[in-house]
Amino acid sequence: MPSLPLSGVPAEHAPGLPPVARRFCRYVRVDTTSDPASDATPSTDRQLDLCRMLVEELREIGLADAEMDATGVVYATVPGTAPDAPVVALAAHVDTSPDAPGAGVRPLVHPAWDGRPFALPGDPAVVFDPATDADLADAVGHDLITSDGTTLLGSDDKAGVAVIVQLAADLLRADAEAQVAGHPPLPRPTLRLLFTPDEEIGRGADPVDLARLGADVAYTLDGSGVDRLNAETFNAAEAVVTVEGVGVHPGYAKDVMVNALRVAAAVVAALPADEAPETTEGPDGYVHPHTLTGEAERATLRVLLRDFTDAGLERRRALVRQAAADAQAAFPGSVVTVEITESYRNMRAHIDAVDPRAVTVALDAARAMGFEMALEPVRGGTDGARLSERGLPTPNVFTGGHRFHSRAEWNTVQNLERALAYTHALVHAWADHGDRRSPPRRP
C-alpha cells in the first residue's frame, strides 16, 4: 500500500490565524496532563503552569480580579451591562487526558484541507481519512488543526479555554469601542469565568467554591463537534477490584500458587463483551475494564461503569460484583473484593429541577443565529454534571473538536470561530431572556 502524504504547517508559521486559533495553539503547547494515581490537588503541578498563564492573560485584558486559588481553580469576572440579568458562569478545564501523551504538543495547521487522506509527520501511522472518520467529511475546506502525531492535540478542553478567554477579550474591546463612539454597550449579564484542573480524572468540579463563583447558571465549553448542546450525561461509577492471590516460587507452585493476574483476567472475561465501549453507542451504557496492575500475588483491576439510567448503573454494579464472586469461587485460595465509588450523576434531572432556562436560553441563542442546536446526551461526563448535582445548572456547549483523548484528535479554525460566535450569542441571549428578579426553582 503506498504511503500517504505527510501534512501540516507548524501553527507558529501558519499565516492569517484568527485570535482564537492563535490563542488555542499557544495553550495546547503547555503540558497539563492530569494523573489519576495522584492524591494531590491538583493531581499534577504542570497544570498550574497554564492556570498561572491564564491569570496573567486575564489581568492583561482588564480582568483585575482574576485569581487562582490554592487548588488551582481560576476565577475571573467580566462585568455585566444588564444589572437584572442572572449571573452566568462559563467554565472549561485546563487538564488533558492521561490516555495519550500530552507533553511536547506541536500544533500543526492544514490550510484549506481538500478532503484527501494524509498522515502526520511525527508518526505516519496516525492517519486522517474520511473513510475511517466520518466527521472529517464536514471539515473539507476547513483549516484543520492537529498535533504532529506524537501527542494528543488538547482540544479537550483547551478549545473551551481559548474560546472563553477570547470572548472576554472581545467583550471588553467592544465596551471600549462603544465608549469612544459614545454608544451604550450591548446588554449582557455579568460573566464569571471558571477554569478547573483535573476534570479528566473526575475531580474538576469538587474544589469549586460555588459561593465564590456566585453564578445563577453556568455552561461548560467542553463539547465535541459543532452546533451541539449536552444537557444529559452518563451516570458514572468506578469499580476497583482487588485480587489477593497466593505467591510461591514458580518452580514449586503446583497446587499452591493462586495467580492473581489470572483471577483478574477471569473477572474481565466474565464481563459482557456486547456491553463494552467498543460495542455500544447512542443510549447504551457500558462496562469498561481500563486498568490492570499487579503481579502474581496481588492485582488491582479498575472498571468504569456508565449508564444513562439509575437502574442501568445499578445493574452494571451487580455485573462486576457477580464476576468477582464467580472468579473467587473458580480460584480457591483467592480473595476478591470490590469497592465501587460514584463519579458523577446524569445532570438532566438537576438542570430541570433548578433552572430549565439553562437549556431553553441556549437553544434560543442558536435560533437567533439562524440554526437549530442539536440537543444530545454526551457519552461521557463534564464538570457540569457535578456542578449541576451541587445546585448550579450547567449544560455543555460545543467547541469544535473531535477524536478526543487520542493522537488523532483534531479541530478546525472555522469550528473554533463558530464556537466563539455561538458563545457571544449565548451570553447576550441571557440579557434578553433572563431575569434575576424571577428566581429559578430550587430542589
Where would I find each of the regions flagged by the language model?
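Metal-dependent amide/peptide-bond hydrolase catalytic core
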Residues: 2-8, 260-443
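N-terminal capping segment at the start of a domain
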Residues: 2-7, 11, 17-45, 144-146, ...
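Fold-independent oxyanion-binding glycine-rich loops
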Residues: 30, 71, 92-94, 148-150, ...
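A non-catalytic alpha/beta surface segment that caps or lines the substrate-entry region
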Residues: 39-85, 89-91, 95
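Short, conserved micro-motifs enriched in small and acidic residues
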Residues: 45, 150-162, 254-262, 410-417
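Active-site metal-coordination/substrate-binding segment of hydrolases
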Residues: 84-190, 215
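Structural motif
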Residues: 86-89, 143-144, 191-192, 216-219, ...
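Midchain, well-structured core segments that form catalytic/ion-binding scaffolds
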Residues: 136, 142-155, 173, 183-185, ...
